[in-house]
């Protein structure tokens, strides 16, 4: 099967006829290769009836953004080692990487949640995008904080790089990275402070246009969708201006039943694509969104976050049964439009990037 357009929320198969399995993902263009790459969490074995949360990090390649060839697992799981952050029972999410010009390394950051208790980063590096990757830090707690969903960005003008991450469940942190991108310097700033679920901001997604910097963020409601927000700023550690919900005509308040995970700038065009996971493709999910949010509000009423320093502890070494069948998750890719400096997103049943 081949494609010649995007059909958001519909089944999307690779060139082998299998569902694309790369969630919590990054998409980018490699000018030298003339290829787009897409990497993310492989959920093919996550049925909701076993101990498997992920099955490694999978890579795809494409020349047209519609048809994707499976390049295999660039970071495989380690099912025989419960002391490894990559054991499939641990919640490995949102693999994101930066290429470090100074070291010539591809630096991959992974969010890990072990036993619903400890959230941290595992940081790996490789000489090639395809790997093999080796650990720099198996368990890394930036600024002695727990860390949830995150985004990475390297500033082309200054050479500095940054990580944006949720400090569960009450702050969004922006921290400056070390020169080799494998840790933080200690410089950081706090944003969206004091919110509690479902309003706590997670799934930060950075992009920039016309000298302005932006973050899409989601609320906190597990795999159930919720309204996105977008903010704008000039200084990474300065004031973030909240621009509200970017989604126009989204009556369900669910980001069109999806969660944005990255923004792709199409080369040689003023076109930005909001790329999102549709974790629950069932038609009735948006109908439950407000009910789920109200339940989260009740559950977290009076929540007092633990702000004590977090130490790096060994993994629990215990398998956890997972109830979510994310092997059926799909994708929603939509073009970003502009109302002045505000990015907005409208639903399209199908569309072609060449026509915009």
Regions found by a protein language model. Give the residues of each.
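Carbohydrate-active catalytic/glycan-binding domains of CAZyme proteins
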Residues: 1-356
